[in-house]
Structures are given as C-alpha cells and as structure tokens.
Regions:
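Non-catalytic structural scaffold of enzyme domains
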Residues: 1-271
C-alpha cells in the first residue's frame, strides 16, 4: 500500500478530463495535478522544447514526492515520455497513448477505418499509428489529422458554440468523408471536452477517448507494484502556471465541487 499522491500533468486543462475517471475507478487515490496553462499549447512546439517543458514539470512533481507520474497529454506522451522515463528510471510512468491504443485494438475490427485526431506534434511523431500496429499489425486503414485550432479554443472555454462547430467541420468534414472513417480516436485529452459536440455533428461515429482509458493503466501499474492507496485523509491539489478563470471553472465543473472545496494553486516553473 502507498498513500502518496499520483502526479498528473498536461500542457493545459485537457488532462483534467482524466481525473473523474481515475477518482471513480480508484476512490482512495489522490492527485497532484499540474497544468502548464501559461505555455500551452505544446502541439505546435519543437520536440526539444516539449521535452524540456516535460522535465520542468516532472522535476516539480518529483519534489512533491509523488508515487507515479502520468503524462495526461498526448503530445508529451508522443514526444516527451521517453525522456521522462530516462530521467526517472525508478518512477512508474505512463502516458495516454498506449491505453487508448489498447482500446482501439479491443474495439475495432480489422476492416474498420480509424481516424486519429491530434496535435501537429503527435501526428508528426506517428505514435498512434505505430502503437496500434504493434497491437494489430494487419490494420491497414489508419488515418490521422492535426487539428491545431482546437486546443487554443478549448483553453478559452469555447467547446460547443458556432465557432467550435465551424472549426470541427473545417478540419473533419473532408477527412471523415474521404477516408470513410468509422471510429474517431481523440488523440488529445483536450478533445474530450468537445466530445458531445463531435457526437452531435457526426452521429453514428464511434469515439475512443484517451482521457477515459488511462485510469485502467494507472490501476494496473500500481496494483502490479503493490502501490494502490488505502483509505486515507490526503487531499488532491491542482496547480497551474497561469491560474486562469477557465482553469478554475473546468476543475469545478469536472469534479462537481465549488472552488472553496478544492485546493487550487498557482505555480510558476521559472517561465
């Protein structure tokens, strides 16, 4: 048993979408969350910068004595995860890409057309395609597209109005039609926040979310190391490098609590 907190981090607010699934599945666990809202989005940055930012956050998490680290950001999972594991070889580390690809392999038939929506950095890394084909080498119909406007809009709280709907149609109408997509994979944790809008615009399409699947990965890793928490009085803490109104609103909405009930703090990483 290990009652230390789990360190979860993201380039912004998207990683918050993982936390309700974690708390439902593992109610005794508590988290330290860090959202790098001052430097978001990561998806358009160089790999060198993404790795440097990843280690900035990881060093902060290590200083808080977390028992494992979760890169709840697909861009970090695609580009920075190996650097994180190299820096902290004794620390359990997971990202969000592999759990999502496990679900793709479980849910999708060999003839289905899979569409991966992600940031430019994640698409360029080919991480999703490679991970899916490790699991299912015969999958031939895997397509991916970058949607760079989504994260900035979501960070501003724009998730279901006409601006977001037009952005979705701009990126996805031709992509879905031309590639005969059957299943969308939300390859960015931010995109969970527009899932309902996607379902409204494209009814009948299957959707797999990287946000939903990571709780299972966390459970498996901690269980295998006998590190699951028991009943305790710990408290989750939420940090952001820019404590915006939207960050606070997102936490309260996702967790169903008032701001006064939550431990929300500002943390600069020497930006």
């Amino acid at each position: 048993m290990d009652n230390r907190k789990i360190g979860i981090f993201d380039s912004g607010i998207g990683g918050l979408t993982c936390i309700p699934y974690l708390m439902k599945d593992l109610p005794d666990e508590h988290v330290i969350f860090f959202g790098d809202t001052a430097r978001t989005p990561y998806g358009s940055k160089s790999e060198h910068v993404i790795r440097r930012f990843t280690l900035d956050i990881a060093n902060f998490m290590k200083s808080k004595d977390v028992k494992m680290m979760v890169a709840a950001c697909n861009t970090i999972s695609a580009v920075g995860l190996s650097a994180l594991r190299d820096e902290y070889p004794d620390m359990p580390v997971t990202g969000v890409i592999e759990p999502a690809c496990d679900m793709v392999a479980e849910k999708c038939g060999i003839d289905e057309h899979i569409g991966i929506l992600a940031t430019k950095a994640t698409v360029s890394s080919n991480a999703y395609v490679d991970a899916i084909r490790v699991r299912k080498p015969d999958y031939a119909n895997i397509y991916q597209t970058a949607c760079p406007a989504f994260v900035p809009l979501i960070e501003e709280g724009i998730t279901d109005n006409n601006v977001m709907k037009e952005a979705i149609k701009y990126y996805l109408d031709d992509f879905i039609r031309d590639n005969k997509i059957d299943m969308l994979v939300l390859g960015c944790t931010h995109y969970q926040l527009i899932r309902k809008t996607l379902e409204e615009i494209y009814p009948g399409l299957g959707i797999i979310s990287s946000s939903e699947e990571v709780a299972t990965s966390i459970r498996n890793i901690l269980s295998s190391r006998d590190m699951l928490a028991g009943p305790n009085d710990e408290e989750s803490v939420f940090y952001a490098s820019d404590l915006s109104e939207n960050f606070v609103n997102m936490i309260t909405a996702l967790l169903g609590k008032e701001q006064e009930e939550l431990n929300i703090r500002f943390k600069s990483l020497d930006i």
